[in-house]
Amino acid sequence: MELSDLIEVTRVRDAFMRKGPRPAQIGDICIFEEFWLLHKAVDRVLCEPISKENPQRGGLLALKCKNFLLIIFEIGDLEICRATARTIEALSNINGFLHDYAFFYNSPFTILDDGWSAFDPEQEFARLMLSTDAFRISSVNEKFSVCPSYPEKLIVPKGIGDDYLKISATFRESGRFPVLSYFHKETRSPLVRCSQPLIGPTNRRCREDETILNSLITINRGYIIDTRSKSSATSAKAKGGGAEPQGNYRQWRYIQCPIPRQREIHDALTRMVDVCSERKVTSDRWVSRVGQAGWLSAVAASLEAAANVAQCIYSEGLKEVPVVIHGGDGLDSTLIASSLSQILLDSDARTIRGFESVIEREWICAGHPFSLRNNHCAYAEGTVTGPFESPVFLVFLDAVHQMISQYPMSFEFDENFLIFLFEHAYASEFGSFLGNSEKEKKEHGIRKKTVSLWSHVHHPENMKQFVNVCYDPTTGVIWPSIAPQCIKIWDRLFFRWQRPDNSWSKPETETIQSLADHWKLREKELTAKASSLRRNVIELSRELRVSSPI
């Protein structure tokens, strides 16, 4: 079908924008050839008469967008209003991404730093080699022959041959065998991610997979972090999946750090957006509904899982403690935990380029299916939606926002950068978030035919809008609190379109400097206190182990 077949109306003249990102005004609605709102940014389209008693008054066209923006137009002719609604609905729900604007976008700025080559895996490996020689680059997945959701080049344990990797892939969900995600220089502890083992009801075993994991062990036992609940892991075993049996993985401790599943996250966001748009409700009832929505719980669970990973890697007095993370298919909660833990552990991941590198490695190249997950957001319902849609990446961004709220001086970027990434993950003129894997990017020539989002960000004129002027680089680990009173609603995300623009304006330079000085002092005090408390906990744990009877 041609795009022209979907277009019933090309332009609607003299429409009145009653509600939107601009002051109320009369103008034309252009379906194409003008760039104001991408078709893909529209999540749901509604059309109804202005007056049911008098249809001659025209219709109301409501566009509910994926970034929670609501736009309402008054159109004088009800039939034209309905035709416009059908057109926008069709264009915003085209299957696939080959007609997305990114393929037709011509960059208005000179690309000074090509984002497509900014995070080359071989460069990443070269930096890793400065810290350890225990790993190598493998081309076992050349032409995506072993695992379609992995990139072609992967970092794996040095002593493991490609034949073992191939066998392990048959034992792991979707072929996602263990690969290096991160290496902590100070403790020399590797972070590895994969998918669940396919042990099934018969307790199937794979000695090659056991060998791969055991090759990571040097002087201390490792940890396997499962991001599923106990019931989910048990249910998975009945369906052919499961978790590593202690008898076969004797050198590993198994820990469960559950993060909500895709559908739970999707429903939580829908409820959260609904609560945040509610006006006629008492404050007590509103607070109760926020808790019942489950969104903040999902963010807190993600932070808790990441903190547990970081705690295993950064155990005081212990070195070389390998950590393996997996959930089910390794495409969602696994990536949340692996990426957030790196931000906790590594100050470089809290810079703009370092954060981009985490997203590129742990989300885009790691195979998070952006096109499937972000096809719709919180408003869409009915037949246009699919079972694979879930705002998993937004949970990650909100968790980072919670870190910034608690450590406002430790990040080179501010929440504007996070919101920018959220919007472009759902609808963008750039190609970075297109497709579901590197395999799809290569098949459709996305890296050749589109502009990278990072090329836009790296331009000096663009980057300055994301810089945190209060940034004070710190090299230490950060430990955000997950206490309920510390996990806050992301105002700028959920209420951005409900407040006047000037309420979000940045304070004056003197005010910023005063706040910066205050938060620097406060952060140092809290960091020192947190370190002291952690030492006390470790000492108490050791005393308990010594005093406990054998």
Residue ranges and their predicted role:
Residues G328-Q342:
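Glycine-rich nucleophile elbow surrounding the catalytic serine of serine-hydrolase chemistry
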Residues M1-V323, S339-I550:
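Cys-dependent protein tyrosine phosphatase-like superfamily
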